[in-house]
Curated annotation (Swiss-Prot):
Cofactor(s) listed in the protein's UniProt record: chlorophyll a; all-trans-beta-carotene; echinenone; all-trans-zeaxanthin
Function field: Functions as an antenna for photosystem I (PSI) under iron-limiting conditions, when phycobilisomes disappear. In the (PSI)3(Isi3)18 complex most of the harvested energy is probably used by PSI; in other PSI-containing supercomplexes a large part of the energy will probably not be used for light harvesting, but rather is dissipated to protect the organism from light damage.
Gene that produces this protein: isiA
Descriptive protein name: Iron stress-induced chlorophyll-binding protein
A biological process from GO: cellular response to iron ion starvation
Keyword entries, A-Z: Chlorophyll, Chromophore, Membrane, Photosynthesis, Photosystem I, Stress response, Thylakoid, Transmembrane, Transmembrane helix
Subcellular location: Cellular thylakoid membrane
Assembly information from the UniProt record: Under iron-starvation forms a complex with PSI trimers, where the trimer is surrounded by a ring composed of 18 IsiA subunits. When the PSI subunits PsaF and PsaJ are missing the ring is composed of 17 IsiA subunits, indicating that each IsiA subunit has a different interaction with the trimer. This suggests that the size of the PSI complex determines the number of IsiA units in the surrounding ring. In the absence of PsaL has a tendency to form incomplete rings with PSI monomers, suggesting PsaL helps form the rings.
Organism of this sequence: Synechocystis sp. (strain ATCC 27184 / PCC 6803 / Kazusa)
GO cellular component: photosystem I; plasma membrane; plasma membrane-derived thylakoid membrane
Membrane topology: Multi-pass membrane protein
Pfam families registered for this protein in UniProt: PSII
TM regions (residue ranges): 25-45, 89-109, 138-158, 208-228, 240-260, 303-323
């Protein structure tokens, strides 16, 4: 991380992963622990939403944020978008809780038993040691991340085509997608109007296209070191890599916010409520187009606005760490204001 020439910087507990930036083993332990927390939240909150779910009311009117995603995947849904069985949701929530325990055990193992520095290992584990100034090793780690993302996209396509299908809001049924769109021109054509997609075949085809693209990119980054032009354009440091990651998450968050707000195929009104209106007050926000009792909000409103504001703050983090990576010292701003006061 950026230390401005001070090699004796001490990070407190609240600094998070910055404490382990130069300890590859503990860095992995922290990531596994964070995955455990994420899985625990997903499992626990799924079970909480099941306890609050009222089948006599529309799902989108109940402020739920996890069950609508599971319903969109076709689990427990009958014709017309009616929820007929919540047991699959209980199973999925329980699996996430079990997975969180396994991941938590892995985090403890990497913290207590595995070396803090993977360079001291022998065998295959040593290849996952990294330093921020080593572009080739960072490329290998990036490649493995892309492989998992690609596998996730293809798993969704597999669920749509072979393992039960997805909920189709246009027919209000759960169906298999036997002929996904594989024409790259059609898929790439959505670049300018992606939020208007209304065909489940196109949606699944897009996941297949992106899945193979990610896997191809993952293999490339594992086998091929960063090219010369990339080394000249990009900064390779912990601060810079963090800024790139935050920028990517911010972009994904803004896209997801708008897509969730207006699209009714990936986010069926039966589960999320009707599309939202884009409003501008002190800041932009997405507003419900229906009035619910007690001034409640639809699931779509919660998700779209949460994604927007989280993306906004991720963007601020991207700019902060990008400037630090370039060498800008924010303490100089404070010093400048202090000099004005004196």
């Amino acid at each position: 991380m950026q230390t401005y020439g001070n090699d004796t910087v001490q990070y407190e507990w609240w600094a998070g992963n910055a404490r382990f930036a130069d300890q590859s083993g503990l860095f992995i332990a922290a990531h596994v622990a964070q995955a455990a927390l994420t899985a625990f939240w997903a499992g626990a909150f799924t079970l909480f939403e099941i306890s609050r779910f009222d089948p006599t009311q529309a799902m989108g009117d109940q402020g739920l944020i996890l069950l609508p995603h599971l319903a969109t995947l076709g689990w427990g849904v009958g014709d017309g978008g009616q929820i007929v069985d919540t047991y699959p949701y209980f199973v999925i929530g329980s699996i996430h809780l079990i997975a969180s325990a396994v991941l938590g055990a892995g985090a403890l193992f990497h913290t207590l038993r595995a070396p803090a520095d993977l360079s001291t290992l022998k065998g295959q584990g040593k290849k996952f040691h990294f330093t921020w100034e080593n572009p080739q090793q960072l490329g290998i780690i990036l490649g493995h991340h892309l492989l998992f993302l690609g596998a996730g996209a293809l798993l969704l396509a597999g669920k749509a085509m072979y393992w039960g299908g997805l909920y189709d809001a246009t027919t209000q049924t759960v169906r298999l997608v036997s002929q996904p769109t594989l024409d790259p021109l059609v898929i790439y054509g959505y670049q300018t109007h992606f939020a208007s997609i209304s065909s489940l075949e196109d949606l699944v085809g897009g996941h297949i296209f992106v899945g193979f693209l990610l896997i191809g990119g993952g293999i490339w980054h594992i086998l091929v070191p960063p090219l010369g032009w990339a080394k000249k354009v990009l900064l390779f440091s912990g601060e810079a890599i963090l800024s790139y990651s935050l920028g990517g998450i911010a972009l994904a968050g803004f896209v997801a916010a708008y897509f969730c707000a207006v699209n009714t195929l990936a986010y069926p009104p039966e589960f999320y409520g009707p599309p939202l209106a884009i409003k501008l007050g002190i800041f932009p926000y997405f507003a419900d187009t229906v009035e619910l009792p007690m001034h409640a909000h639809t699931s779509r409103a919660w998700l779209a606005n949460a994604h927007f504001f989280l993306a906004f703050f991720f963007l601020q983090g991207h700019l902060w760490h990008a400037l630090r990576a370039l060498g800008f010292d924010f303490k100089r701003v404070e010093q400048a204001f202090d000099s004005l006061q004196t």
